Amino acid sequence: MPAAWMPVLRLGAYASRVPGPAGGDGAVPIAITCFTRGLDIRKEKADVLCPAGCPLEEFSVFGNIVYASVSSICGAAVHRGVISISGGPVRVYSLPGRENYSSVDANGIQSQTLARWSASFTVTKGKSSTQEATGQAVSTARPPTGKRLKKTPEKKTGNKDCKADIAFLIDGSFNIGQRRFNLQKNFVGKVALMLGIGTEGPHVGLVQASEHPKIEFYLKNFTSAKDVLFAIKEVGFRGGNSNTGKALKHTAQKFFTADTGMRKGIPKVVVVFIDGWPSDDIEEAGIVAREFGVNVFIVSVAKPIPEELGMVQDVAFVDKAVCRNNGFFSYHMPNWFGTTKYVKPLVQKLCSHEQMMCSKTCYNSVNIAFLIDGSSSVGDSNFRLMLEFVSNIAKTFEISDIGAKIAAVQFTYDQRTEFSFTDYSTKENVLAVIRSIRYMSGGTATGDAISFTVRNVFGPVRDSPNKNFLVIITDGQSYDDVRGPAAAAHDAGITIFSVGVAWAPLDDLKDMASKPKESHAFFTREFTGLEPIVSDIIRGICRDFLESQQ
């Protein structure tokens, strides 16, 4: 019998256990969430009620008709056409585990492949208890009380001090063999457990390097250590050449996307396990990974003995593949036995986000303060244009608690900190507070304002790994000296961009700006002319940041 028919025959065997919808027992359906999985239902048969409005793009579904139990029940029901996004009753049948869950695009959901899983389920159209009794269709939009179902807030879990999106690239070649492959998986499981995986902590995925690289699961598939450990256990040994370079390049290019669970502003990390030495060139893959902003760690096990060195393409493969050749990104274990003592030091490295040099870009590793002129000559309508200018710059950057940070000070003769670098850690909150800034009105003392900002805004973050920038926007001449305070700011490592409008003297703008003055000082006659300067400021910040990294 052709092998291609085997899944159909298996499904036929499963189907013999599955009664039609009319065979229900009249039980009241259990209300579940959009993301309740098959493994969360511990019954051979269950009637559930999927809510309306589940986001299709966030469903995690593995297989077709028969789904891995790690799949979303409601996602599987929509995928199979049992319900629409309006929700409704679904009957769930538990099935044995299997191999080769297929990927099928159906009803707006692209299910994913999975090599193997320990349990499965299938779904059919269910009936509510009212339908069972009367045969009448009933609405599932509201419960019988007429009140809306309360959405259960997602519990925030994980180690908040360890923010990273991590791909474990394990060795699945014949070189490592089945026994050491299992020891390798045990070690990866221990690392995953200690990381503190969760919605607020690190997210992890797994790629196996063999003849052809295979992504076993993505960042978005599991957000608890328990599920990750189970998924690692289920990964099967593939064999073939290690082709680590090919696998690393594939991981850097394909693994980290928004669709697969990558989070903005979070360091991207690949931990490469190499048993012995790679069978292909790994240097080029390291270059590609760095270009994609990926921090590559190499965990090497059992270095080649002198007699084997002739078979190694490049004995310096570790130094050429890691993010930086500074010792931080390389890690060695003598063998796969007694590896528990190596877990904690590796976890500490993976959680040191300030050391993730390859993740640092001008968009996620800068502190930018805006010094905004609130003097009487500006006027309320023009002040709004200044705030729009500030917002358009700020929204370009990847603002987060470990990424770019924004602050704002308004000045007249006095100074007012509108918000500091540590007040807001999301782009949405930063943009909202910028819009809410109230116009002060008064005189113009720019020099005092610079000194105030250096002391009170940049002072608390003087030890930050981010590069510091100050953008000054003013429309007139300062009543005090600007040269001295600006020089002090430069000496403190703060790069200044000065933006003048209307009556702002060019000499003051140049005195405040960092060198070269021509690329750090800007002027426009009208407040409506601020908009074209936005891109100049952003390019300038990125240019200065890159120069500081060399």
UniProtKB/Swiss-Prot annotation:
<keyword id="KW-0964">Secreted</keyword>
<dbReference type="Pfam" id="PF03815">
    <property type="entry name" value="LCCL"/>
</dbReference>
<comment type="subunit">
    <text>Monomer. May form homodimer. Interacts with type II collagen. Interacts with ANXA2. Interacts with SLC44A2.</text>
</comment>
<keyword id="KW-0677">Repeat</keyword>
<keyword id="KW-0272">Extracellular matrix</keyword>
<dbReference type="InterPro" id="IPR036609">
    <property type="entry name" value="LCCL_sf"/>
</dbReference>
<feature type="signal peptide">
    <location>
        <begin position="1"/>
        <end position="15"/>
    </location>
</feature>
<feature type="domain" description="LCCL">
    <location>
        <begin position="28"/>
        <end position="121"/>
    </location>
</feature>
<comment type="function">
    <text>Plays a role in the control of cell shape and motility in the trabecular meshwork.</text>
</comment>
<feature type="domain" description="VWFA 2">
    <location>
        <begin position="367"/>
        <end position="537"/>
    </location>
</feature>
<feature type="disulfide bond">
    <location>
        <begin position="34"/>
        <end position="50"/>
    </location>
</feature>
<feature type="glycosylation site" description="N-linked (GlcNAc...) asparagine">
    <location>
        <position position="100"/>
    </location>
</feature>
<feature type="disulfide bond">
    <location>
        <begin position="54"/>
        <end position="74"/>
    </location>
</feature>
<dbReference type="InterPro" id="IPR004043">
    <property type="entry name" value="LCCL"/>
</dbReference>
<feature type="region of interest" description="Disordered">
    <location>
        <begin position="126"/>
        <end position="158"/>
    </location>
</feature>
<dbReference type="GO" id="GO:0005576">
    <property type="term" value="C:extracellular region"/>
</dbReference>
<keyword id="KW-0732">Signal</keyword>
<dbReference type="InterPro" id="IPR050525">
    <property type="entry name" value="ECM_Assembly_Org"/>
</dbReference>
<keyword id="KW-0325">Glycoprotein</keyword>
<dbReference type="InterPro" id="IPR036465">
    <property type="entry name" value="vWFA_dom_sf"/>
</dbReference>
<feature type="domain" description="VWFA 1">
    <location>
        <begin position="165"/>
        <end position="350"/>
    </location>
</feature>
<dbReference type="GO" id="GO:0062023">
    <property type="term" value="C:collagen-containing extracellular matrix"/>
</dbReference>
<keyword id="KW-1015">Disulfide bond</keyword>
<protein>
    <recommendedName>
        <fullName>Cochlin</fullName>
    </recommendedName>
</protein>
<dbReference type="InterPro" id="IPR002035">
    <property type="entry name" value="VWF_A"/>
</dbReference>
<dbReference type="GO" id="GO:0005518">
    <property type="term" value="F:collagen binding"/>
</dbReference>
<feature type="compositionally biased region" description="Polar residues">
    <location>
        <begin position="126"/>
        <end position="139"/>
    </location>
</feature>
<dbReference type="Pfam" id="PF00092">
    <property type="entry name" value="VWA"/>
</dbReference>
